[in-house]
């Protein structure tokens, strides 16, 4: 095989490898949702589901908008490993719980917010704000 063809083959193999390795990182971080960390917003609603999974747990709420119409709102939370260190469990939220949670809303206006790190959480009138440990900082 000619040296130039050999170099092209190696370069193509390298590029395919880099793209293949980048896909999982994009899948984890490439949700397409950008959050506005300058506008903490309190969302109040009723829990419909709590998904305790990696890479981030998700909380789903039925929230009434200004007109009284119920809309689903999703909250992206920490990973289960971090949440455990903060004193949370996979049974933290149950369907039907009344929740008030401070989130950073999606910049797009979508009904999605981020509660990664520490955010104020009240469940059925009880403060359930996660504890922050040195390891979480």
Where are these regions (language model features)?
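Short boundary/loop segments of OB/S1/cold-shock single-stranded nucleic-acid-binding domains
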Residues: 26-41
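Bacterial N-terminal signal peptides that target proteins for export
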Residues: 2-15
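Short nucleic-acid-contacting surface segments enriched for D/E, G, S/T with interspersed K/R
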Residues: 85-101
